[in-house]
């Protein structure tokens, strides 16, 4: 074998979530001591956002309590699958997960993590969730350069977040653009939207699904117009609970709402950053 001198980015880590494929370079340092990124947090603490993961599992358990077995959760912006894995393990025998990730290299890690953790009730899809079907050119970052890859915005705008490396929006790869309505799922209990500025488009593309199933929706608002997000959710009959850089939207007809309402203060204190 002729050594190629390659930098190794993706590694296996024995984490509290199970054996996980992580990018050891998935970080952006804020200063000499502090950084962020899914891989960074797992390698530093053996887990990613434990409080938020527990909250999501608790929400799924509540939906089972009120609506019975067959719970379905959609993880949009699944990254390497921390939420997907934890949800799938928790729902063994009574629920399933659809995980969607737009970045190809991260999608490979997501699919591998589903397989290596034997989550037979989870499915991974490579695509960008939007308001319409088609093809979306997205930037192609260097995964061997330290960056917070989960913070990558698929579209260029004024004020794109710096993730740790310059992003060339002319150097793109095509990815499938899809709507959640395309899946025609008969039941959906939770839709997590953490897709770096495309959350409003995803809601529009899930109009039929939302109207039919009235799922709980944790939505990141950091890179979109928060007032517009609130209006879009309230117009669909949702109560919007503030939770740091996210909102938790629960339909006013949902029997779980009365049990969820006491949680906003705790959720805001945690200020979760979904991934």
Which positions does each model-derived feature cover?
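Core alpha/beta nucleotide-donor-binding catalytic domains of modification enzymes
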Residues: 111, 115-143
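Short catalytic-loop micro-motif centered on adjacent basic/acidic residues
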Residues: 73-75, 97-100, 190-193, 217-220
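Conserved S-adenosyl-L-methionine
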Residues: 125-127, 238-246
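Hydrophobic pocket-lining residues within nucleotide cofactor-binding pockets
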Residues: 78, 127-131, 180, 195, ...
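A SAM-dependent methyltransferase catalytic signature shared across enzymes that methylate proteins
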Residues: 119, 231-242
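S-adenosyl-L-methionine
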Residues: 1-103, 108-113, 117, 163-170, ...
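Short internal loop-to-helix segment that lines adenine-nucleotide cofactor pockets
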Residues: 37, 41-72, 135-137, 151-213, ...
